[in-house]
Amino acid sequence: MPELPEVETVRRGLAALVEGKIVTNVVVRYSKMVSPKAEIFAEELEGKKILNVRRRGKYLLIDFSGDYTMVSHLRMEGKYSVVDRREEYGKHDHVIFELDDGKDLRYNDTRKFGRMNLVPTGEELQVGGLKTIGPEPTPETLTLEYLTHQLRNRKRGMKSFLLDQSMIAGLGNIYADEVLWLSKIHPQQISNTLTDEEIAILRESIFEELQLAIEAKGTTVFSYLNADGHAGSFQNQLHVYHRQGLPCQRCGTPIERIKVAQRGTHFCPHCQVLR
């Protein structure tokens, strides 16, 4: 599933390609993917200008003229691309936004899990998981005071805590593993046992890891592509994720893989000791 760095990379690509363009027609080939009903969804967007492409956590927010905002969640396999309209539809191109420059903004999703909700601008934070989403992982919004309070007032494994979108927005399986390795914290360490120093290091590790991943245009482990159709490159910089059996880049101990919070979880048993 695309996490914050991947969605931010898609956002930047789409902003450069489609902001200012007018939607002349919308083709919905899989009606369960959109809300409201496909006919209304298409009718409301026809003739609207794309004003802005934003992001909140793992969600894309596309603002249109007429005070509409589309909330788009890529889920597992969703991808956006901008192509020449003469190009044939792909098998998994499910929603097509025809633009006034002769190109299409196409949404492709092999597993059909992605969703698009069109709502009046200002109501986008009432859609799905956005109702309870936590702060963005930036120094301004993820303060040390906030993080300390949330960790100290909960008795949860650290991997589960980081995956909880109501605690911190945007982290998923890949970056949770990587952040915990950077912080030398075991994935099953209980949140309220962290020291002040560990919490401070964890916070800085979150900022560092996500910034590096955004600069590398995300991680492509399976099928993620950005809006230009290119893979990310951060998979070449991963320390633990999908590296089970390989030596830890810090101490040489083989990386192990266990199941935590129903997710495959990678860590170094020497650097990340469970207390």
Swiss-Prot record:
One of its GO terms (biological process) is base-excision repair. A zinc finger (FPG-type) spans 239-273. Signal peptide: none annotated. Its EC number is 3.2.2.23, 4.2.99.18. One of its GO terms (molecular function) is class I DNA-(apurinic or apyrimidinic site) endonuclease activity. PROSITE patterns: FPG_CAT (PS51068), ZF_FPG_1 (PS01242), ZF_FPG_2 (PS51066). Its cofactor is Zn(2+). The keyword Transferase does not apply. Binds 1 zinc ion per subunit. InterPro entries: DNA_glyclase/AP_lyase_DNA-bd, DNA_glyclase_Znf_dom_DNA_BS, Formamido-pyr_DNA_Glyclase, FPG_cat, MutM-like_N-ter, Ribosomal_uS13-like_H2TH, Znf_DNA_glyclase/AP_lyase, Znf_FPG/IleRS. The active site is at residues 2-3, 58, 263. SUPFAM superfamilies: Glucocorticoid receptor-like (DNA-binding domain), N-terminal domain of MutM-like DNA repair proteins, S13-like H2TH domain. It catalyses: Hydrolysis of DNA containing ring-opened 7-methylguanine residues, releasing 2,6-diamino-4-hydroxy-5-(N-methyl)formamidopyrimidine; 2'-deoxyribonucleotide-(2'-deoxyribose 5'-phosphate)-2'-deoxyribonucleotide-DNA = a 3'-end 2'-deoxyribonucleotide-(2,3-dehydro-2,3-deoxyribose 5'-phosphate)-DNA + a 5'-end 5'-phospho-2'-deoxyribonucleoside-DNA + H(+). Keywords: DNA damage, DNA repair, DNA-binding, Glycosidase, Hydrolase, Lyase, Metal-binding, Multifunctional enzyme, Zinc, Zinc-finger. DNA binds at residues 92, 111, 154. PANTHER family: FORMAMIDOPYRIMIDINE-DNA GLYCOSYLASE. Involved in base excision repair of DNA damaged by oxidation or by mutagenic agents. Acts as a DNA glycosylase that recognizes and removes damaged bases. Has a preference for oxidized purines, such as 7,8-dihydro-8-oxoguanine (8-oxoG). Has AP (apurinic/apyrimidinic) lyase activity and introduces nicks in the DNA strand. Cleaves the DNA backbone by beta-delta elimination to generate a single-strand break at the site of the removed base with both 3'- and 5'-phosphates. Belongs to the FPG family. Monomer. This is Formamidopyrimidine-DNA glycosylase. It comes from Pediococcus pentosaceus (strain ATCC 25745 / CCUG 21536 / LMG 10740 / 183-1w).
